[in-house]
Structures are given as C-alpha cells and as structure tokens.
Amino acid sequence: MDILYIIFGLALVLVGAHILTEGSAAVAEKFGVSEFVIGLTIVAVGTSMPEFVVSSAAAVQGSSDMAIGNVVGSNIFNVFLILGLCALVSPLPFTRNNIRFDIPLVFIASMLLLVVASDALLGLGEVNLIGRIEGALMFLCYIALIAWSVRSSKQDKQEVAAEPRMKMWVAVLAILGGLVALVVGSRLFVNGASSVARSLGVSDALIAITLVACGTSLPELASSLVSVAKGQKGMALGNVLGSNLFNILFILGGCSMITPLTLGDITIIDITMVVMSAVIPFIFAFTLKGRNLNRIEGAAMVAIYVGYVAWLISQVA
C-alpha cells in the first residue's frame, strides 16, 4: 500500500505542476506581471504548502526535529538539486533584481536562521532553540520582504498579452486545482516514503532532512522543471527563491510561535548548508560571462547535494 501511495502521489504532483504553471503564466500575461513575481508569490507559497502542513503538524505534536528538518532539508533540496537540475535542462539567467535583491534576501533569511538557532554557540542558552519572539521576528520579516521584493520587481513588468492563453476564471481554477493536486500528491508521497523509512529503523532527523524534505519539495521540483521546459525560467527561479524565503521566515517563524523549536539531531552543519545554498548561486552568477547558472554549475550543485546526503547517511551507518 505504501508503494501505491508513493506512485499515486508522484503522479498527482506532476499533473498538478503542469496545471499550476499554465494557470500562473496566464495570470502573469493578463496583468502584465513578470513571471518571476508570480513564481515568487503565488507559485512559491502554493508549492510550499506541503512543508507548511508537515512542519506545523510536527510542531503541534512536539517533534522539533521533524519541523526544522523538513524546512532545512527542503531549502537545501530546492537550491542544490532543483536549480541544479533546471540548469542542466537549460541555463538559468539571473536578472538584475535577482542579483541585487532576491538572492541577497534569501542569504539574509538564511543567516537569520543560523543566528537564532545558535543560542548555545553564542552563549545565550544551554540549547539551540528558536523561541517565540524570534519566530515572530522571522514571520514579520517575511511579510516585509515579500512586499519589498514585489515592489522592486516592477521594472520587470511585461506587456499585457493581446490574446491570453486562457480566460481568467479558467486560470484561477487551474491554479487552485494545481495547488490541490500538489498538496494531496505530496502528502501521499510523504506518508508512503516515511512509512517505508521507519520500517527500516531510520531516525526522525534523517527522515525529515532527506525523504520528507524531498517529498514536500516535489511540487517545487515538478513546477520548476515544467516551467523551464516551457521557457518560463523566471518563474522557476522565483519559485525556488520564494519557497526558501517562505520556508524559513513564514513556516519556521510561525511554527516557533506555536511552540519553541529545539534543535535535537539537527546540527548547525545542516543549517550552515542552508546558508551555503544562498551563497553558492550568488557566486556562480559572477563566475562566467552572462550572469547565468550554466549546465556545468548546475551539475556541480547536484553533486554537492548528492555528497551532502551521502555524508548524512554515513553519519548514521
């Protein structure tokens, strides 16, 4: 039964990603909004709903490792694997706003997470803990950063399409239907994969950072790859960056307001990888001409993710 959940869940995710991408692109055309802004807001928040549901449920149940590990693992997965694979399909160009605002914003959010989760290292407490006040600060930062990012992206505004690809009510239904399929499909996948992993005796922390994070990030993976395949690269990049901001500031901020989150088996090394996931794309943007993420750099990012997961597994072997 678990295998059927995994297969059916994956199928729903793929179908949902296609429908969501089409609907979102239609909305962008209708209002003359850039694909990046749509990816940063509607698509990013929608595809991060599985992370929100899983982490919120884990926080309520007192499983800090699952709540934090899901977000940490998802952010690492989003950048290194998703952007890496997207770049392998087709090089991803960085816009001026990406370099000046969007990537630095993700870096700042990642550094904020590192600081608030390092109480013991900074001598502020006996354990590394994300408290309610810190969570509220992160939550408010998300609202402010999204408003600023959308406003600063106005210069990327594109012309309204003379003949939109679909009617507005159809586009709205496509977005809603796609999001529902993504959330349900991801949930089925996570339940099936987690059940299989637990039967093998794997720890909650490892499950959260790897299997659960990968499962809840399937919407981002599917929607980003479909966007790139359709030539909507701005939406793919906005989806990943927006999802990472949402995961750190909104999800962890909100969860820690529900109950303080303690880092158990989740280490500072894991959170440092989240910071590196914001630094490396920024570095790659300036390594070669054109300010884009090319196939070689994409392959390097995929290799980094594979190496990180291999290291995690080796720690419990």
Predicted ranges, named:
Residues 1-317:
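Hydrophobic alpha-helical segments, chiefly the membrane-spanning helices
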